[in-house]
Structures are given as C-alpha cells and as structure tokens.
From Swiss-Prot:
One of its GO terms (cellular component) is nucleus. In the pre-SET domain, Cys residues bind 3 zinc ions that are arranged in a triangular cluster; some of these Cys residues contribute to the binding of two zinc ions within the cluster. Zn(2+) 2 binds at residues 312, 326, 365, 369. It comes from Xenopus laevis. Residues 571-586 have a biased composition (Low complexity). S-adenosyl-L-methionine binds at residues 397-399, 632, 635-636. This is Histone-lysine N-methyltransferase SETDB2. Zn(2+) 1 binds at residues 312, 314, 318, 324.
C-alpha cells in the first residue's frame, strides 16, 4: 500500500513539474523588459484593453471546458493557466488520474529550431500561439521567430503532426459568438493566428501569415480557400482574411461621447448594428423606414418572368470562368459593349473583393445556382452588410458615414436601398400589357432621366449630405474611357431635357397578368364609350380622369385627379362600377400627358438598364427619401474612397440591378466613407452649391 501511494505521488509530482515547465516564460524576456512593456502599455492606456481581451479568451475557454467542446490544445492551455494562477495540486489530482497519453507536447527553447510539419509537405516554421490577435515576427534566414507586438511573447510552443485537414480541424468552435464585430476579427476569435513576418528587405515590408487551429500555415487567399473547402467551414469566408499589412485588426478609433447616439438605427434589420452618434448637437436624422434591400424586388416588377438568364452548378467555389455560367455572363456583357477587350484581365470578384468597377454590371450567382452559398466566390453583395458602420454628424456636410474598423481595398461596404419607382419618357402614353409598374410611388413629382446612375438629394442651405442637397450623378464610369461607342449614347435623354419640360412623363401602373389585363382593358374601353370615363386636359395635368373627381395631392405632393374609391394609374381611371380599380391601358391616348416639371428635391438613385437605353424606354430609379438604408447617408467627395457598382442579384433584368459600394483603397478606422456623384459642372447651374469635400482636386461645385 505504501509503495502504491509513493508511486502515485511520484507520478503526480512528475506531471506537475511538466506543467510547470510549460508555463515558464522565455529566457529572452528579462524583468526589465517586462516592466518596460507594462509601463508603455500603462502610458498608452491599453492595460485594461489587454486584460479585457485575455478575459474574453478565458470566458470562451471556460465555456468550452464546461460543454466538452475544447480541443486537446485548449485543454492544455486551460491546465497551464490554472497551474500558473496557483498550482493547486489538490484540484489537479483528479484530472491527472485520467488518461492523457493522447496529448503530445514538445517543449523547446526559443533558440532551438524544431521542424514543424503541417498539411503542406516539407514546411519548416515555428508556430505562433498567443492570446493576442496580431503577432509581429522577425525573419532572419529561413526560420521565422515570433515576437508579440500587442502582449508579452508566447509562454509555450506547441507543434503539430502531419495530418490531412478535414472538418475535425475546426470542430468545437462556436462561431455564433462573434457575428457582430469586425469581420476580420472572426478568424482570430476562431483560434486562427495572424502573424506579421518582417523580412530583411529593402522595402522593409512585413508579410502576413495565418495559422489555422490545427497548425496549418495559410500564406495567401488561395490557400485560405482550399483550407475552408477541405474543412467544410461555413462560418468563415475568404473575405474574413486580409493579407494586406496596412490593415490592422486592432485599429479602433476613439470618438467623443455623442450628445445623441443610438447603438443600431436599423433596429436589427441588418445582421451588423448600424450605430449613430451626434457629437455636435442633439439633432437626429429625419424619420425613415429602414430597408435592408430595395422594395419592391425587381423580379416582382417584371411579373416573375425571365428572372435569371443562366445558373451554374459549380463545385469549386465558382473560380473557373470556363465552367461557371454566372462568371460568363459578366464577361460576355463587358465584351459585348466594349469596342476592344484586348488586355482586359479577369472580370468580377477576386477573393470576394472587387478591385475595379465593371461598367456593364456584375452578375452574382443566384438562388437557382447549385453552388455552395458560403464557399462560392461569386456571392458578395447578396450576403448583406458585414462592416461596422456609424452614421455621424459632420461639421459642415450634415450627416455622414464612417467605418469603425480598417477596411481592405475592394471590400463591399453596403448597397443603396430605397423604393423602386418607374417612369416613362414618351411624349405619349403607350400602355401595353407588357408595361412595368411602380407600386407605392412616394415621389411623383421628382424625376429626371439619364442613361446612367443619378443621385438626387434634397437641397438645403449649408450642406450636401442626405436629404440636404440636390445632387445629379451621371455615369460613375466614363463609358468613353472604357471604349464604349459614343453613338450608342447619342439618343439618350439628358437631365437638361428633363428640367426644360420638353419631355413628358407618366407613372406606369402595376402590371397584371395578361389575361386579367386584357379584361380590364376591354372594360375600360367600354366605360369610355359609355361615357363613364372621360379624358380631361388642363394646363397643369393632362390625363384621363373620372368625371367630377376632385383634385388631390399624393403623399409626395404631386397633383392628381382621382375618385375616392379608385386608384391612380398612368393611363386612366375607372368608375366606381368597375370591378377593378387598377387599369393597364392597351391603346395610346390621343392627348399627351402633362409636361413634367423636375425639381429634384428627393433622395433618388436612377438606374440604368443598358448603355443602349434611350428616352423612349422606362426609367427606373430608387427613392430613399422615406425608405432606405445606411447608404442614403453617404456624402460626396471629389476624391472618394468608394466606387459604385451595379450588381445583378435577385434578377438578371437590366432594369433592376443592386447599387453597391466598394472601397477603392485601404480605409483606416474612423475615416468617412464617400463616393463621387460625378456631377458635370454647368449641367444644372441653377441648382449648384459649393462642394465642401475639402480635397485638393475639389471641383468646388456640386448639385
């Protein structure tokens, strides 16, 4: 009995000493260095921040130990932390009785070099296993040596054996705890390590290396995509990683306490909260309905016909343009409209980031495609807002939007959402069963026409932020510079023509099925012949109206004539005896409708159907004055950090693209996000105001 007790105590003592050895700090860290480190952190005011990060890690580790989802490495980490905190042998005794032969740990000094084998053969490198998010690494020769730049150096080095990566490499990671923070921090929260490798080179630039939880090294986006595919990971994407050494994961800008603030103006509509802060006064943005996407959907306006031209069934993440039909659509549309496509590189997303705008539009994979929704590299905008944005009050420009974290180049920021409205630019109304509709027009009075994208904001005295200034945005991409034929745009209706009142507009009705529409058309003609419905003309409104109908105003202020029990349409009204209140006329009226007087006093984005679009075609645009998303607050700049891209997501109809914003450079945390309205000076001279962007290349005028 005594021999058995002595043997058990000897085993316990040896294993305790082994754990104590694991917790010994590196010999390279002296007492003076440690004191200096914490003094510097105290001076920077980051002591609380560092321990908060450590505490968060401990809470996660605590939960994993409790529910049994911890990995072997995490079990070892937990024992080391407990041992370092108190070396409580009584608490460890029962745990050490369990079988721990499956855990293999190699302990080496800092100055010793040990081969590290991972999934890729013949790789030799050290592993960074810290509690911090970033680690700086100096490389001399061929072996990197990790030194932390945020917290003290790693207390231990754990090496991994050769294996084939699979779902077990990411098992036990609870990704649902980290969905509303910096998207680039998500891999770090999932036990990935992001190391800066400083190589002795003339440019003295550091290189980024990611370490997977299983020890595999990820040196570029292709290796990241391969790893996520092999492990079947559905909570991480390629754009959650950044190999740009100018992008910091811990760059959090500190702002003054807002006089008025809100943690989420979207009211949980967005997957990421959209914060609001006013540090200048106690005003808030005017009330509006927050919409994640535009309404109504484009496919519904087209009567759910011809929604998608093609769909794919890729299994490689839609990387090969030769096999992906959706990638081919983007390339074909671009090649068709370009006079010469020689020297043009691959079009579309690269690692789920868009480096340059595509003037002819970008086709994403859709709901009909069989490709994996998370691993697909051609699905970005449809995933919605991922960045942490904040609406704030600027000193001179009204409301603006800034990012709360560093953003890499080509990253999707947000879309411009609103209510889709439709007008026609014909001198006479040609209502046919195939006409489209606008349901819920909120601004019948405000409209212009252009072949490209136009932004129109309400004009005020001192600023040009949302709902405060009228801005006309012509094509954000110069078609001429991209080789588009100029003669294709010769017949396009210009904004100047819209303001002069030479063109006449009408609001299209909601399209009905053809069978029902033909019945309604027949009924309308019968009513006109019987005298129940007449056509009346006036100096202000020329259009069909029901007899003895009082003149009323719509919600947007446009004067219309309608019966209390009937709905307004573009082609006529029906008497109360009619079976339907919505009419889609089938024949052109003898009298043209009233001349439209454009005042440009609403927040409106006009959508282009194609470079060949002419004034005879329907004009579709977004009105964000009453309904919209965070994109309605984006300001203008003559030197912007965003560019606009039309993306086809829920339909391939060229009339209904999604208007998306992407970064054209690295944007540091706290920087205001802006885009160029591309206003041509002199186009609307009576509505020009001073541009307040403050850039050296400022044009001084904007609408």
């Amino acid at each position: 009995m005594e021999q058995s007790a002595n043997a058990r105590q000897s085993t316990l003592r040896s294993r305790t000493q082994e754990l104590n050895t694991l917790s010994v700090l590196s010999k390279d860290v002296s007492l003076e260095d440690a004191k200096k480190y914490w003094k510097d952190r105290q001076a920077d005011g980051k002591v609380d921040w560092i321990f908060e990060k450590v505490l968060n890690k401990l809470k996660i580790l605590w939960q994993k130990i409790k529910d049994g989802s911890a990995t072997n490495l995490e079990y070892v980490r937990a024992v080391i932390l407990v041992n370092e905190a108190g070396n409580l042998e009584e608490d460890l005794e029962e745990d050490l009785k369990e079988d721990t032969d499956t855990i293999h740990i190699d302990i080496h000094k800092e100055n010793e070099v040990q081969e590290n084998t991972d999934c890729s053969p013949e790789r030799k490198e050290d592993t960074c296993l810290n509690l911090n998010t970033d680690c700086g690494t100096d490389v001399s020769g061929s072996e990197p040596e990790c030194n932390s730049t945020v917290s003290p150096p790693a207390a231990e080095r754990v090496y991994f054996g050769n294996h084939s990566c699979g779902p077990s490499c990411l098992s036990g990671i609870n990704s649902f705890l980290f969905t509303k923070g910096n998207p680039l921090q998500l891999p770090i929260s999932c036990d990935f390590q992001r190391c800066h490798l400083k190589i002795n080179s003339p440019d003295d630039l550091s290189h980024i290396l990611y370490k997977a939880p299983c020890g595999r090294s990820l040196r570029d986006y292709d290796e990241v995509h391969s790893y996520l595919t092999e492990t079947g990971c559905h909570f991480l994407a390629v754009d959650n990683f950044s190999f740009n050494n100018h992008v910091r994961l811990d760059s959090n800008s500190s702002f003054n306490q807002g006089i008025v603030q809100d943690c989420d103006i979207s009211n949980d509509v967005e997957s990421v909260p959209v914060a609001f802060s006013n540090e200048i006064d106690n005003t808030r943005p005017s009330n509006f309905i927050y919409r994640k996407t535009s309404w109504p959907p484009g496919y519904s306006l087209n009567n759910f016909t011809d929604i998608f031209v093609k769909c794919c069934n890729c299994t490689d993440g839609c990387l090969d343009i030769l096999t992906c039909s959706c990638l081919q659509l983007t390339a074909q549309a671009f090649t068709k409209c370009m006079e010469s496509s020689l020297g043009i590189g691959p079009l579309g997303y690269k690692h789920k980031r868009l480096q340059e705008p595509i003037p002819t539009g970008l086709y994403e994979c859709n709901v009909s495609c069989k490709c994996d929704r998370m691993l697909c590299q051609n699905r970005v905008v449809q995933h919605g807002l991922k960045l942490r944005l904040q609406v704030f009050k600027t000193n001179t420009k009204g409301w603006g939007v800034r990012c709360l974290d560093d953003v890499d180049k080509g990253t999707f920021v947000c879309i411009y959402a609103g209510r889709i409205l439709i007008r026609t630019a014909d001198c006479t109304v040609k209502s046919t069963p195939d006409d489209s509709v606008a349901c819920g027009n909120e601004d019948h009075e405000d409209s212009t026409s252009t072949c490209a994208l136009i932004l129109s904001k309400r004009k005020r005295k001192t600023s040009h932020s949302d709902s405060e200034v009228t801005v006309m945005h012509t094509n954000p991409y110069s078609m001429r510079s991209h080789g588009l034929s100029v003669h294709r745009l010769s017949n396009t209706f210009s904004p100047r023509q819209a303001r002069s009142g030479e063109r006449e507009f009408s609001l299209q009705p909601l399209r009905r099925p053809k069978t029902k529409t033909s019945m309604l058309q027949k009924r309308r003609r019968q009513l006109i012949e019987e005298g129940a419905c007449t056509v009346q003309n006036s100096s202000e409104e020329e259009g069909p109206t029901p007899p003895q109908s009082p003149e009323q105003k719509s919600s947007a202020g446009t004067k219309i004539q309608r019966n209390e029990n009937s709905d307004e349409t573009a082609s006529g009204y029906v008497s109360e005896e009619s079976s339907s209140s919505v009419i889609s006329g089938g024949h052109p009226l003898e009298k043209p409708i009233s001349k439209f007087k454009s005042k440009l006093n609403k927040t409106t984005v006009y959508l282009s159907t194609s470079p060949e679009q002419t004034c005879e075609e329907n004009l579709h645009f977004l009105d964000a004055s009453k309904e919209g998303n965070v994109g309605r607050f984006l300001n203008h700049s003559c030197c912007p950090n965003l560019f606009v891209q039309q993306v086809f997501v829920d339909t391939h109809q060229k009339c209904f693209p999604w208007v998306a914003f992407f970064t054209n450079s690295v944007v540091k945390a706290g920087t205001e996000l802006t885009w160029d309205y591309s206003y041509d000076i002199g186009t609307a001279a009576d509505q020009e105001i001073q541009c307040l962007c403050g850039q050296k290349t400022c044009k001084n005028k904007v609408v």
